[in-house]
């Protein structure tokens, strides 16, 4: 039920107002005379599904072209808990995502519109934003209104499920590569507003304690599931600092001439899927707070290690990689580019060998969190006072759940067996 209770809007952000809703409704419908009559705000993400922002679904009732209209949008807002904001550096991540939508996606939209291919952009449309470091929010179209539904982050995905996401990444990365090939200076200009929010040496003191807990959990899993094996012995000598520094190195030494604007955080909760009338499956990608310029392999690796199970990796790993590259080739051809001129299969497979470790290293942080049930997830709004480090909130410990522990150990074993570590 909608109302005219302005406190509902203020619960999103003190700067999220009725005027904001009107501007959003105008952009959404194209009617400059649209009128907002009432609204409602409800939570749009479950506990444990989103840590860096508060996600709400806002219903807007109004008059469009003189007729009653109801629309829903998604609003990502910086948490109102000031301690939480400080601990998690929320403003840095919001600044990065705002730049992604206002600079990078704006360029992609312009590029695709000129080619009559805007429908290829599988990213929610940005309908409004505010960025001041304290009251930030981003308003996005509601993918549910287009038939998309969320994904269970606790389940391990099978081959056919993974193909849907690999195709979605081929589409998104293919657009990025086509823009790079055809409008390189414009892309470089747009991406200069992105700022690495995690894997840079200055953030080790902020991130290192928690990342060490994650690697400790993975080492414990290996010791219990694969004790005394060469893989367990190799991983036992690996430190969190070495893995973190390797990620920093890969970002600093990437091939500056060939890159995509990575999603950066490709675990299950950042996708929604739907079934099209012809029976095909489709996916949309969202939550770009970790967007960065890097090899597309990073997104694929992170997805593989946080979402798939051992059986899927063992049977279909190479198939998925080839499927992705072939799908990207088709998208780029549709946009007037030849993938073989910029990112042939040989270069892609070379980057798999060299760069897959990035998704492996980052995935070891995310996988333990992704396997927590809602009851086990951390309540970030309980943070008050002098808590200064994320490790004081994300008090991750080795799991006693054998299924989850084996899943974590199998990720480590796969990375080592394939020479990524």
Model-derived features: where do they sit?
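Juxta-kinase regulatory segment immediately upstream of eukaryotic protein kinase catalytic domains
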Residues: 2-41
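Active-site acidic catalytic loop and adjacent metal/ATP-binding pocket
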Residues: 49-63, 74, 239-296
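Active-site activation/catalytic loop segments of kinase-like enzymes and analogous catalytic loops
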Residues: 99, 103, 290-334, 359-391
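Helix-rich C-terminal or lid/interface subdomains of diverse kinases
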Residues: 330-421
